[in-house]
Amino acid sequence: MLALALAAVLAQAPTPSTPSKKDAYLAAKQDAHTRRPARATQRADRPIWARNLRTHEIRALTGPSGLAEGAAGQAGRSAFFRCWFTHGEGPIPAALVAVIVAAAEHFEVREVQIISGFRHPKYNLLLTKKGREVATKSQHPLGNAIDFLLPEVEARELYEWLLGTHDGGVGFYPISEFVHIDLARKRTWRGT
């Protein structure tokens, strides 16, 4: 009788050739994963965006209309990274924007938040007189500096990565949670 009960249970069990629901789910998931495009292709299709926190403008940094390369060029960079206080524009080198793009690609983020790019000399002087953390020989009035952050990336982690990759100045502002990069000589400092 025990043999009959065991035979009945074995007859009802699924045959090994029939995959279980779990096996079918895992196989479908693996197929979907292998059909995804390569990461390099995704980067080409999806631009990196910059959001200017002072002017509330959003522009593509990469792609055919991007500020790093392409049709926008120097005029587009000058307009986007302009002084928010005077609306004065200064030359922002493509090499500076390329550092920001490299950081975004390294940390796999699609948005960069810009705090400050070109800073008009009068505005820089005003900040100095108010006692703000502004260098007397700041690179911002020359158009050679950008303050920025990457959402979802710790400012310290971004700072440490930039120290190893960027050949210019790198400043770290842990309380304000942003970093400064410029094209002057290699140096580093810590602000608030």
Give residue ranges: language-model regions.
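N-terminal secretory targeting signals
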Residues: 1-52
